[in-house]
Protein backbone atom coordinates (compact mmCIF):
# COMPACT_ATOMS: atom_id res chain seq x y z
CA UNK A 1 0.00 0.00 0.00
CA UNK A 2 1.58 3.25 -1.12
CA UNK A 3 0.99 6.26 1.10
CA UNK A 4 0.44 9.45 -0.85
CA UNK A 5 0.75 12.42 1.50
CA UNK A 6 -0.59 14.89 -1.06
CA UNK A 7 -3.81 12.88 -1.45
CA UNK A 8 -4.28 12.72 2.32
CA UNK A 9 -3.78 16.48 2.65
CA UNK A 10 -6.21 17.12 -0.22
CA UNK A 11 -8.84 14.96 1.51
CA UNK A 12 -8.31 16.79 4.81
CA UNK A 13 -8.71 20.17 3.09
CA UNK A 14 -12.08 19.09 1.69
CA UNK A 15 -13.39 17.68 4.99
CA UNK A 16 -15.89 19.51 7.18
CA UNK A 17 -15.13 20.47 10.77
CA UNK A 18 -17.30 17.62 12.03
CA UNK A 19 -15.47 15.13 9.82
CA UNK A 20 -12.11 16.44 11.03
CA UNK A 21 -13.28 16.18 14.63
CA UNK A 22 -14.26 12.54 14.03
CA UNK A 23 -10.87 11.93 12.40
CA UNK A 24 -9.03 13.33 15.41
CA UNK A 25 -11.09 11.17 17.78
CA UNK A 26 -10.42 8.07 15.68
CA UNK A 27 -6.67 8.77 15.62
CA UNK A 28 -6.68 9.32 19.38
CA UNK A 29 -8.43 5.99 19.96
CA UNK A 30 -6.34 4.05 17.43
CA UNK A 31 -2.96 5.23 18.69
CA UNK A 32 -3.79 5.89 22.35
CA UNK A 33 -2.82 9.56 22.21
CA UNK A 34 -4.59 12.81 22.93
CA UNK A 35 -4.54 16.00 20.90
CA UNK A 36 -4.94 18.09 24.07
CA UNK A 37 -1.58 17.14 25.62
CA UNK A 38 0.56 19.69 23.74
CA UNK A 39 -1.86 22.48 24.65
CA UNK A 40 -1.72 21.56 28.34
CA UNK A 41 2.06 21.40 28.24
CA UNK A 42 2.25 24.81 26.58
CA UNK A 43 -0.04 26.30 29.20
CA UNK A 44 2.04 24.78 31.97
CA UNK A 45 5.20 26.27 30.50
CA UNK A 46 3.92 29.81 30.91
CA UNK A 47 2.39 30.53 27.54
CA UNK A 48 -0.97 30.95 29.23
CA UNK A 49 0.31 34.29 30.50
CA UNK A 50 0.56 35.48 26.93
CA UNK A 51 -3.14 34.79 26.50
CA UNK A 52 -4.06 37.14 29.35
CA UNK A 53 -5.73 40.34 28.29
CA UNK A 54 -5.04 42.40 31.40
CA UNK A 55 -2.07 42.68 33.70
CA UNK A 56 -1.28 44.17 37.08
CA UNK A 57 2.02 46.04 37.24
CA UNK A 58 3.66 45.50 40.62
CA UNK A 59 6.60 47.51 41.92
CA UNK A 60 8.63 44.94 43.87
CA UNK A 61 11.57 47.17 44.88
CA UNK A 62 12.59 50.78 44.30
CA UNK A 63 16.30 50.09 43.94
CA UNK A 64 19.03 52.67 44.55
CA UNK A 65 17.46 55.48 42.51
CA UNK A 66 14.37 55.99 44.65
CA UNK A 67 13.78 59.61 43.60
CA UNK A 68 13.67 58.68 39.92
CA UNK A 69 11.28 55.82 40.65
CA UNK A 70 8.99 58.18 42.60
CA UNK A 71 8.90 60.55 39.60
CA UNK A 72 7.92 57.72 37.25
CA UNK A 73 5.26 56.46 39.69
CA UNK A 74 3.81 60.00 39.84
CA UNK A 75 3.76 60.15 36.04
CA UNK A 76 2.03 56.77 35.71
CA UNK A 77 -0.51 57.08 38.52
CA UNK A 78 -1.18 60.82 38.48
CA UNK A 79 -0.73 60.84 42.26
CA UNK A 80 0.94 63.61 44.23
CA UNK A 81 4.46 63.45 45.61
CA UNK A 82 3.39 62.20 49.05
CA UNK A 83 1.20 59.42 47.63
CA UNK A 84 3.81 58.34 45.08
CA UNK A 85 6.49 58.23 47.80
CA UNK A 86 4.19 56.09 49.97
CA UNK A 87 3.64 53.67 47.08
CA UNK A 88 7.40 53.34 46.53
CA UNK A 89 8.18 53.08 50.26
CA UNK A 90 5.57 50.34 50.75
CA UNK A 91 6.83 48.12 47.90
CA UNK A 92 5.79 45.58 46.83
CA UNK A 93 2.74 47.51 45.66
CA UNK A 94 0.56 47.47 42.59
CA UNK A 95 1.11 50.52 40.39
CA UNK A 96 -1.51 49.78 37.72
CA UNK A 97 -4.32 47.22 37.68
CA UNK A 98 -5.96 45.81 34.57
CA UNK A 99 -3.48 47.27 32.09
CA UNK A 100 -3.25 45.92 28.55
CA UNK A 101 -0.14 43.91 27.68
CA UNK A 102 1.37 46.80 25.71
CA UNK A 103 0.64 49.34 28.44
CA UNK A 104 1.94 47.02 31.18
CA UNK A 105 5.19 46.42 29.28
CA UNK A 106 5.60 50.17 28.68
CA UNK A 107 5.13 50.91 32.39
CA UNK A 108 7.53 48.11 33.30
CA UNK A 109 10.18 49.51 30.95
CA UNK A 110 9.82 53.03 32.39
CA UNK A 111 10.11 51.81 35.97
CA UNK A 112 13.06 49.53 35.22
CA UNK A 113 14.82 52.38 33.40
CA UNK A 114 14.43 54.41 36.60
CA UNK A 115 16.05 51.58 38.58
CA UNK A 116 13.02 49.76 40.00
CA UNK A 117 12.25 46.04 40.03
CA UNK A 118 8.86 45.26 38.48
CA UNK A 119 6.73 42.17 37.91
CA UNK A 120 3.65 41.70 35.75
CA UNK A 121 0.85 39.58 37.15
Swiss-Prot record:
Keywords: Ribonucleoprotein, Ribosomal protein. CDD domains: Ribosomal_L7_L12. The gene is rplL. One of its GO terms (biological process) is translation. The keyword tRNA processing does not apply. It comes from Streptococcus agalactiae serotype Ia (strain ATCC 27591 / A909 / CDC SS700). GO terms for cellular component: cytosolic large ribosomal subunit. Disulfide bonds: none annotated. Homodimer. Part of the ribosomal stalk of the 50S ribosomal subunit. Forms a multimeric L10(L12)X complex, where L10 forms an elongated spine to which 2 to 4 L12 dimers bind in a sequential fashion. Binds GTP-bound translation factors. It comes from the Bacteria. GO terms for molecular function: mRNA binding; structural constituent of ribosome. Gene3D superfamilies: 3.30.1390.10, Single helix bin. Belongs to the bacterial ribosomal protein bL12 family. This is Large ribosomal subunit protein bL12.
Amino acid sequence: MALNIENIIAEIKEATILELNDLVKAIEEEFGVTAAAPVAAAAASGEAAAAKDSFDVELTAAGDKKVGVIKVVREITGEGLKEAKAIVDNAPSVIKEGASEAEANEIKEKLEAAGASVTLK
